Design a protein with these regions (language model features):
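Residue-level marker for buried hydrophobic side chains located in beta-strands
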Residues: 1-3, 85
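Alpha-helical metal-binding/catalytic segments enriched in His/Glu/Asp
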Residues: 3-57, 181
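Solvent-exposed, polar/charged alpha-helical surfaces in well-ordered, non-transmembrane soluble domains
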Residues: 24-31, 60, 64, 107-114, ...
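Sec-exported extracytoplasmic/periplasmic mature domains
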Residues: 28-38, 63-71, 114-121, 139-142, ...
Length: 200
């Protein structure tokens, strides 16, 4: 299983909200798990992608080379892979998860979100979120999810604009996101079974 986001950004700015924030959250989630002495039953990989902005080439290359897909053939790791959680929608706080049409995970994620209800993390969107690295997994029939976030000024001011700079980052929101991501990763890594896959 894995958590992560993409390293590359558009050339007009430093890419603070797209997607240095997502990378920082994934790194901090791993640091949290290490700091609390977590002993997960499954390996948790941090997956930091190149060339997301050029068509998800980093994540799609990883899936193609290491996991495969049912149409073209799978690797031995395909059946063992559990889930990938992604952050790539700006600096805003997590509010839930896009389910990508996988209703089998609804009760699982709902239970995992309960400790964060007081922070407003309570939404499970039935809709698919497109255009970022979890899609490489989802399109190969593997569980891949993007967290649902507050938009802040993401689409209006920072997304692919020259204003995507450090002072637009909201540190307190990113701290909450790191805790939620760490919790989801730990829960997924401690399950007896991989995360359920949606019907194809």
């Amino acid at each position: 299983m894995g958590i992560g986001g993409h390293l590359d950004s558009w050339h007009t700015s430093t890419g603070a909200t797209d997607n240095a924030g997502g990378v920082a959250v994934a790194l901090e989630a791993m640091r949290i798990l290490e700091a609390i002495g977590a002993q997960p039953r499954r390996t948790i990989r941090i997956m930091l992608w190149s060339n997301e902005e050029g068509g998800l080439r980093g994540s799609r290359g990883y899936v193609r080379n290491h996991l495969g897909n049912p149409e073209d053939g799978t690797t031995p790791d395909y059946d063992d892979f559990s889930v990938y959680f992604n952050m790539d929608n700006g600096t805003g706080q997590f509010r839930g998860v896009h389910l990508q049409g996988n209703q089998l995970v609804r009760p699982i994620f709902s239970a995992w979100m309960e400790p964060f209800h007081d922070l407003g993390v309570r939404t499970l969107s039935q809709f698919s979120n497109r255009g970022t690295d979890h899609l490489a997994f989802d399109q190969a029939g593997l569980p891949g999810f993007q967290f649902l976030q507050d938009r802040i000024d993401y689409r209006a001011r920072t997304h692919h604009f020259n204003m995507d700079v450090f002072d637009k980052v909201l540190p307190e929101d990113l701290k909450i996101n790191a805790v939620v991501m760490a919790s989801f990763a730990y829960h997924a890594a401690m399950r007896d079974e991989p995360i359920p896959r949606k019907a194809r």
